[in-house]
Regions:
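Hydrophobic core positions in small helical hairpin nucleic-acid-binding modules
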Residues: 1-206
Length: 206
């Protein structure tokens, strides 16, 4: 989380400049964002890539409709198993001792944000789970409003595993040195949670 910004954001930063390229699927979706070959721009200069994530509560799937026969491999939706694996890691990490972290945002302010935003309540149920098996979508878009990836939310609340799974999936398709700013309306809460657990692979800077 870049706490100096007025817009909640999470920054997942690498260190040095590399010459490489993004996965072709990203280049096809937005050449302006992902068509470059030079990565490692400092965050003070804006980083390399800007994306945003949020939940949409108006896209639901009725349980009674069932599942259609599988006839293609979805390229926009990440698998439920991938999301659940991230959730299992988060649950496991929360049982570890908290890491020491220094946040630029006081805990009191973050607590007020958590109390005032429905999206920050991971247990808030906004659709009847007995009627819908997928109650909303979590999405990741680039700075040009182009959808990159989606995840079906299949439980009450906008739990953190959905946004983190999308971010992890994005980074699996980027050069290892890419610096990315992730905007999220409750990013301050997500950043505090991540600062208290151990997360593998790349490091989050807040």
């Amino acid at each position: 989380m870049d706490s100096s910004s007025s817009t909640p954001s999470t920054v997942w930063q690498q260190e040095s400049l590399s010459q490489s390229s993004c996965a072709e699927i990203l280049v096809q979706r937005c050449p302006a964002c992902f068509g470059g070959i030079s990565f490692g721009r400092p965050l003070d200069d804006g980083g390399d890539i800007h994306v945003a994530t949020d939940g949409n509560f108006h896209h639901r799937h009725r349980r009674s409709a069932g599942d259609c026969p599988s006839f293609y491999e979805p390229s926009y939706f990440i698998p439920k198993a991938q999301v659940d694996a991230v959730g299992c890691h988060i649950d496991h990490a929360r049982h570890h001792p908290s890491k020491s972290s220094q946040s630029g945002v006081p805990d009191e302010a973050i607590d007020q944000c958590e109390a005032s935003y429905e999206a920050a309540d991971g247990q808030k149920q906004k659709a009847a789970m007995d009627n819908f098996d997928d109650t909303r979508l979590m999405m990741l878009i680039c700075r040009h409003d182009i959808p990159l990836f989606f995840a079906n939310i299949d439980m009450p609340g906008e739990q953190q595993k959905f946004s983190i799974a999308l971010i992890c999936h994005l980074f699996s398709l980027l050069p290892s040195q890419a610096n990315v700013v992730v905007l999220y309306d409750v990013g301050c809460i997500l950043a505090r949670s991540l600062s208290r657990v151990s997360f593998p692979a790349r490091s989050f800077l807040f």
